[in-house]
Amino acid sequence: MGSFKSSVFILVLHLLEGALSNSLIHLNNNGYEGIVIAIDPNVPEDETLIQQIKDMVTQASPYLFEATEKRFYFKNVAILVPENWKTKPEYERPKLETYKNADVLVAEPNPPGNDQPYTEQMGKCGEKGERIYFTPDFLAGKRLDEYGPQGRVFVHEWAHLRWGLFNEYNDDQKFYLSNKEIKPVKCSADIAGKNVVNHCQGGSCATKPCRRDRVTGLYAQECEFIPDEQQTEKASIMFSQSIDSVVEFCTEENHNREAPNMQNQRCNLRSTWEVIRDSEDFKKTTPMTAQPPQPTFSLLQIGQRIVCLVLDKSGSMAIGDRLKRLTQAGKLFLLQTVEQGSWVGMVTFDSAAYVQSALRQIKGGTDRDALTKSLPTVASGGTSICSGLRSAFTVIRKKYKTDGSEIVLLTDGEDNTISSCFNEVKQSGAIIHTVALGPSAAAELEELSKMTGGLQTYASDQAQNNGLIDAFGALSSGNGAVSQHSIQLVSRGSTLQNSQWMNGTVIVDSTVGNDTLFLITWTSQPPQILLWDPSGKKQDGFVVDTNTKMAYLQVPGTAKVGTWTYSLQASSQTLTLTVTSRASSATLPPVTVTSKVNKDTGKFPSPVVVYAKIHQGGLPILRATVTALIESVDGKTVTLELLDNGAGADATKDDGIYSRYFTAYNTNGRYSIKVWALGGVNAARQMGISQQNGAMYRAGRMKNGEIIWNPPRPKINIDDLLSKQVPFSRTSSGGSFVASNVPNAPIPDLFPPCQITDLKAKIQGDSLINLTWTAPGDDYDHGRADRYIIRISTNILDLRDKFNDSLQVNTTDLIPKEATSEEVFVFKPENIAFENGTDLFIAIQAVDEVDLESEISNIAQVSLFLPPQTPPETPSPSLPCPDSNITSAIPGIHILKVMWKWLGELQLSVALG
């Protein structure tokens, strides 16, 4: 399975706090404040879009208020206007609001024409989502027929984002069998409608009833459930908010637990209202007695980036070449990472602070070089972090307000006075990114990142892991076009002996290549450096800085697409290689990797979930090899293979988000996380995919008793997607979390197998049941479980609530496979009536070798459907005599009703006028 394996490639996580979310949303007396809606820089300037956003939120607020029994409404919203739009007096500079922490992103569809609203969800049921996505055409009302009013859709997506709800429809399986009946996947079950198919042939289409498959007993995939125009049922918003009568979430009383949808699968059959009721929002509010006010809006426009480096030069920075490594990382940031046009200042500190450079705008190489000369070269003195921060505020205020500015704070020392400036930090409106260097950095350091929405990173003293350079490489702007951001392609290090070589390759794909930099560092003597481009041409021109112990090559123009080859030779020292680049075009989105953990504190024995999102614009990158390297404060590392398989820690298969549980704690303290991503080489292929967490696309709607069909919904075809993917490698930088409550070795086994979330069941033959699922491990999704317990019941709630009392299946011959493997098990139900029309529910529990049990799996369902026997053929020398009568409803018109006796497939219809 490769869960724990060594890798020389490392990709640092770009840590966007998650549950740990960087979101600024907070609840204040029933009203949601701090909502950030960002307009993507690639959206053409259109002032009406701002009004459309306001209209959507204004419509959504009372709908949300009534749907939550007068408990929640939208109080204020900040709209981020792109920097490349015209400035206006009413546009203010943001404070902590950035594109990185935006809750809603308005962007052009990718691929074109796919305007489905959706929410990115990485976590479990009840865990907050990441971000809502809308397109300009959707906000302009051009998709009303497909999705319904924009305000209602916003509430549907808000429920994904804020409360971790899932959809109550299912595009992959629209119908299911229950008690011999075919039922649509819907909630509530009382929503009325018709099961029909839009049959098109020869350029014309006709609405026809769905036909039952004689083998499966279900309707064909093209069959659709079209809700009636007039409804009385009020639930549920997570099924179809577009139905006029739907104004509520499903409750325990009207929730359809049998429907095979994501809400039932991910939330253990709980209704959406039950999940909302368990949320922190619900627990700390009571219903309002008056109507809420309308939302208020602030318009914020991104301006030039303002950054001040605040760098520790205390005596402890002389340990283990820390100051030299800081200079190397600082040079990468100043020469490459920080964007053109940015303003950069620098402060150093020990027990006092020293201004090394006032704010200086990056206009070209001269400015970058000048700033590198201000980096510290001597370490001495104590540690006063607040002195450094206060000095940085002063540097910034000499030219700009501190609102929305950024401070990069690096320290390796302890400082028990850091909390004395917390209030000043909060009032400043500045975003603080923290870099903890070594094992003794101030324990409260990360609080500065948390309170301001900055990145928190940790770099150990293990130079070969390149952690400090990766941390500074992560500090690209949280705003602006992604085409301007620095992207790490490779980050690698190695300790060499006896004239050994460090050999390898770097893939420069077609989405990057501008401003490409090769950076090499060493700890003793300059190594021999050999580099060839994809055509085999040797590259010269490395700038060698022996004082800083680094060399770098800036590739002119756009680097050649293909595989670059390098060889580095040295003896008895550590080398590192970092390669960065920028997008090759402003119109072609680059492949990007961002990542996060689900918590900033890992409290043993609770696992930490590591996520990596790999996308090109709005399209997911599939079948990539993604590896996370997790380094503890004592230098030990664990390697995880992250997976996009929809099992274990991974919420959704094939969404470009790769996930895995981390359980291998070995000590308390900080852990850094690094990930390597390699893709586009051995990609598999399968059918088309659609957004899993989006509003339902209406196939059609009833109007005046007639069905009006919408165009078929656009789908992402994985075949097309993979054919366009090219080989690539990526690194992205800088995340950490803090572990606590880790016992001394030997660490006891307190981790159970993870929950099975992808159990599927189907009938095999006349009476066998075929089960498939992804194997959990001994410790969550690592190792191998000891055994499985499978139980069945004809009552779905009994199986959920009384699992141990339900009938157990004989699994003597079922031996668990290694975690992440596919399991298949076929059995014949015994000691239970299993006949035509029987609905049977199945669930699994995994148990490890010390008898720790997983949570009960999702519940799978099978319905035994025995096709009716085909009647024997009988000779029919002549047509039978039908039963007939004639009715006259309108003078002059007679309708002959003909009732034929059984003639197999013969159907006749006669109309006379």
Swiss-Prot record:
Domain comment, as recorded: The metalloprotease region is responsible for autoproteolytic processing. It can also cross-cleave other CLCA substrates.
Could you identify this protein by its name? Calcium-activated chloride channel regulator 1
Glycosylated at which positions?
503, 514, 770, 804, 810, 836, 885
Question: What is known about what this protein does?
Answer: May be involved in mediating calcium-activated chloride conductance. May play critical roles in goblet cell metaplasia, mucus hypersecretion, cystic fibrosis and AHR. May be involved in the regulation of mucus production and/or secretion by goblet cells. Involved in the regulation of tissue inflammation in the innate immune response. May play a role as a tumor suppressor. Induces MUC5AC.
Organism whose genome encodes this protein: Equus caballus
Which residues hold Zn(2+)?
A: 156, 160, 167
Q: What induces it?
A: Strongly up-regulated in bronchioles with recurrent airway obstruction (RAO).
Q: Which CDD domains match?
A: vWFA
UniProt keyword list: Autocatalytic cleavage, Calcium, Calcium transport, Chloride, Glycoprotein, Hydrolase, Ion transport, Metal-binding, Metalloprotease, Protease, Secreted, Signal, Transport, Zinc
GO function term, MF aspect, one: metal ion binding
Annotated ranges, domain VWFA: 306-475
| Signal sequence residues | 1-21
User: Where, per UniProt, does this protein localize?
Assistant: Secreted, Extracellular space
Query: What family is it from?
Result: Belongs to the CLCR family.
Query: What would be one Gene Ontology cellular-component term for the protein?
Result: microvillus
